[in-house]
A protein has these predicted regions:
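Conserved N-terminal entry element of GNAT/NAT acetyltransferase domains
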Residues: 1-21
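Helix-loop element at the rim of GNAT/NAT acetyltransferase active sites that forms part
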Residues: 23-38
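Active-site rim helix/loop that mediates acceptor-substrate recognition in acyltransferases
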Residues: 36-58, 62-64, 68, 72-75, ...
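Conserved acyl-donor/pantetheine-binding loop and adjacent beta-alpha core of acyl/acetyltransferases
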Residues: 72-108, 166-170
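Conserved GNAT acetyl-CoA-binding A-motif
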Residues: 104, 130-143
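Conserved acetyl-CoA-binding loop-helix of GNAT-fold acetyltransferases
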Residues: 106, 111-113, 117-130, 152-153
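C-terminal "cap" of GNAT-fold acetyltransferases
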Residues: 141-145, 164-184
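Conserved acetyl-CoA-binding loop of GNAT-fold acetyltransferases
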Residues: 152-161
Length: 184
């Protein structure tokens, strides 16, 4: 299994809905949980909501017929600063401004365990962000997420921390930003 065995494909929201079961299975495998466990059920709910958001895009990675990883996200709507709500340290008003074409949220990037550390995540990341027309991308991680150094090595910079909502996995999240277009 090498990155050379993987093919990447771009999909919109309708196609993502058709692929939902496969996405849930890959998500569960990435985290080493059963598909019916709460973590996967919560992922399903989040994903279904995002499929219809403006600017939604999904990139899948397959080895033959097997979905080995995926990433997806959506564009923040104009005038909506909810994503940045409560971020500390507080950024400038200009930083918070959303136009509907400024910021793309990298919501999920998941790779099956057998395919981790083989370049699939980076390939998905670059394919998704390389196709974007926004000025920047953003993502949120748990404060102690093992992925943080990986994101930083890919050019992301931490801009602050936001409080989590009731029922979230974490009580707080670190927000990262990456200027687009991505260059390697």
């Amino acid at each position: 299994m090498t990155i050379n065995d993987v093919s990447l494909s771009h999909h919109g929201g309708e196609e993502a809905s058709v692929l939902l079961e496969e996405l849930c299975d890959a998500y569960a495998d990435a985290y080493g949980v059963e598909p019916g466990e709460e973590k996967t059920v919560a992922f399903r709910r989040r994903a279904e909501k995002q499929f219809s958001r403006p600017g939604f895009a999904l990139v899948t990675a397959r080895d033959g017929g097997c979905l080995v990883g995926f990433t997806f996200g959506y564009t923040l709507p104009g005038g909506d600063t909810h994503w940045w709500g409560g971020v500390q340290p507080e950024p400038t008003a200009e930083f918070l401004q959303e136009t509907g074409s400024r910021t793309w949220v990298l919501s999920e990037i998941e790779v099956r365990r057998a395919w981790q550390a083989k370049g699939v995540g980076r390939a998905l990341h670059d394919a998704a962000l390389g196709a974007r027309g926004e000025e920047r991308a953003t993502l949120a991680t748990g404060p102690d997420a093992a992925a943080q150094p990986v994101y930083e090595s890919w050019g992301w910079r931490r801009v602050g921390r936001i409080p989590g909502d009731e029922g979230d996995y974490y009580s707080a999240y670190d927000l990262f930003v990456l200027e687009l277009p991505v260059s390697r």
